[in-house]
UniProtKB/Swiss-Prot annotation:
GO terms for cellular component: extracellular region. This is Conotoxin Vi14b. In vitro, inhibits proliferation of the mice ovarian cancer cells ID8. InterPro entries: HSP_DnaJ_Cys-rich_dom_sf. The modification N6-acetyllysine is found at residues 15, 25. It comes from Conus virgo. Keywords: Acetylation, Disulfide bond, Secreted.
Amino acid sequence: QQMCGRCGGTGQIIKNECKTCHGKKVTK
């Protein structure tokens, strides 16, 4: 699963963006 780049890697990813933590998604 892909993780957010901010907020300690937490948050829901919607439309390639982290909605809950307002960060950018990181692909690993």
